[in-house]
């Protein structure tokens, strides 16, 4: 198979949502219908019945939320699919934002009862900025939901994108009958299947005028469906794939992931319309997937995916060419040649060694501590891929060693967890104390839990009053030195040795910006 043929087979996408919209459940069902798993780990009302395949960290299984991005690959109808299931909890949005740099399209899950929520808007802003094609899945139709047309209006208004429904629900809640597939012009009726298997019984009706429809869903609902689909065709433009690929139009599907409604239709339409790997921007040029030479970048690092083996995996997105096992590649940041004897493909925590990987694929590289998020690998060209964000943390605490005998374990744990990008480490210039900065409070809990369970280290937190952390730099060396001297008590360095100003109030920050005109203050820093 040629490189171009391999490229056209790949579909790499992320599933994103506001917490509790049913994102991990939908991911499970896509894997189920794709044949990658045979029974989904039903995740209901935040209680884990069976651990969801994609929630592979112990704390995720306990709490019923996703706090790290996991990668799952499978083959379906001749296509190679990579799904990235992202954290829904807003405290872990940073991991989600970074994941969006590694995907070619996105499925946004919306709770049909709640509509568009705050986290959904923020995620859509990132998709819009990156011009990432978006499909919307309106979930939980088995519960009472907003009117479908009201939901479509809300999506257009709140997410600022034109929509086109490609499926349509028949009622919702207790009277939910199923979903009409507008794209394929057929109706598939599912029964609620608590066994959660993919072979749920279906009834197909290819003609809405057929009297069979009245028999299956009653005359009342059949009449309503005919009117609704007529209205859809009258109100919304015909589906335009090019507009979807330009991120100007969002196809919308309706269903209930937990009951298997509408998931198969979503998957089958997705593999037909979603983009294959797209060009990737670097600081110097655009990299095209069909280029002969391999390029790729690390968008995530995860320590202890298997606590028994203390392994650390760097997730590499292949952007062009062919990645080969045991072939030398340039690690651009260090300038060193490296080869990998056991690169892996993923099915959540299940990993298998691969010999080749192609654009769109995500490869796991064993990492002994050499890699950072944003690192680029090439066959010799010095490239740096752009747009992998790091956000200014909003919550801060001192981290202290709670067990003097475990100093080394704590230091190693902090070092590795910060490399993953779960939080940021600052060392105070005043007293050398370590400060952890996070986007949300739950991250402190996760760090403490993982230090205890993965590194056998104990930490305790102490409060510190910081309003904002901002990275500073200046072409005026004299003013920079003067600033650092005057603000010594508020200065720190980050893990990479960069200067950071820890402003204790918004007034102090505004005053610093006013008095030191030659200094640039950054609230985000790309890795």
Feature map (PLM): residue ranges:
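Structural and coupling elements of P-loop NTPases
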Residues: 1-527
């Amino acid at each position: 198979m040629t490189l171009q043929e391999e490229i056209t087979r790949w579909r790499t996408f992320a599933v994103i949502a506001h917490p509790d919209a049913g994102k991990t459940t939908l991911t499970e069902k896509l894997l189920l219908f794709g044949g990658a798993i045979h029974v989904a780990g039903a995740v209901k009302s935040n209680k884990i019945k069976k651990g969801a395949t994609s929630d592979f960290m112990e704390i995720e299984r306990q709490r019923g939320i996703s706090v790290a991005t996991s990668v799952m690959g499978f083959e379906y109808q001749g296509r190679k699919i990579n799904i990235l299931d992202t954290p829904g909890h807003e405290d872990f949005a940073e991991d989600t934002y970074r994941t969006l740099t590694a995907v070619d399209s996105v499925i946004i899950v919306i709770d049909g009862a709640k509509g568009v929520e705050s986290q959904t808007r923020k995620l859509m802003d990132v998709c819009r900025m990156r011009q990432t094609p978006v499909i919307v899945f309106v979930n939980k139709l088995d519960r009472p939901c907003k009117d479908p047309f009201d939901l479509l209006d809300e999506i257009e208004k709140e997410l600022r994108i034109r929509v086109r429904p490609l499926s349509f629900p028949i009622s919702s809640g207790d009277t939910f009958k199923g979903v009409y597939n507008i794209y394929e012009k057929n109706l598939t009726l599912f029964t609620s299947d608590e066994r959660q298997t993919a072979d749920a019984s279906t009834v197909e009706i290819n003609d809405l005028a057929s009297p069979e429809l009245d028999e299956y869903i009653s005359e009342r609902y059949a009449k309503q469906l005919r009117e609704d689909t007529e209205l859809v065709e009258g109100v919304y433009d015909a589906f335009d794939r090019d507009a979807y690929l330009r991120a100007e139009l969002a196809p919308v599907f309706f269903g209930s992931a937990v009951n298997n409604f509408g998931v198969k239709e979503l998957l089958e339409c997705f593999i037909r319309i979603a983009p294959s790997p797209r060009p990737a921007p670097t600081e110097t040029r655009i990299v095209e997937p069909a280029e002969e030479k391999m390029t790729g970048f690390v968008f995530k690092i995860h320590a202890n995916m298997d606590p028994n083996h203390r392994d650390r995996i760097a997730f590499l997105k292949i952007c062009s060419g062919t990645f080969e096992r045991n072939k030398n590649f340039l690690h651009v940041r260090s300038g060193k040649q490296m080869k990998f004897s056991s690169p892996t493909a993923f099915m959540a925590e299940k990993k298998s060694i691969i010999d080749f990987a192609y654009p769109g694929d995500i490869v796991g590289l064993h990492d002994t501590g050499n890699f950072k998020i944003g690192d680029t690998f090439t066959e010799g060209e010095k490239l740096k891929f752009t747009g992998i964000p790091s956000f200014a943390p909003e919550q801060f605490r001192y981290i202290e060693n709670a067990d003097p005998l475990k100093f080394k374990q704590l230091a190693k744990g902090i070092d590795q967890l910060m490399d993953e990008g779960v939080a940021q480490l600052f060392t105070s210039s005043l007293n050398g104390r370590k400060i952890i900065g996070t986007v949300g409070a739950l991250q402190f809990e996760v760090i403490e839990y993982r230090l205890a369970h993965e590194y056998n280290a104990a930490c305790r937190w102490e409060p510190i009053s910081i309003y904002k952390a901002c990275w500073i730099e200046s072409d005026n060396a004299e003013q920079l030195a003067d600033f650092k001297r005057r603000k010594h008590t508020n200065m720190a360095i980050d893990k990479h040795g960069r200067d950071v100003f820890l402003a204790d109030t918004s007034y102090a920050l505004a005053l610093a910006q006013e008095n030191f005109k030659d200094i640039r203050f950054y609230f985000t820093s790309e890795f």
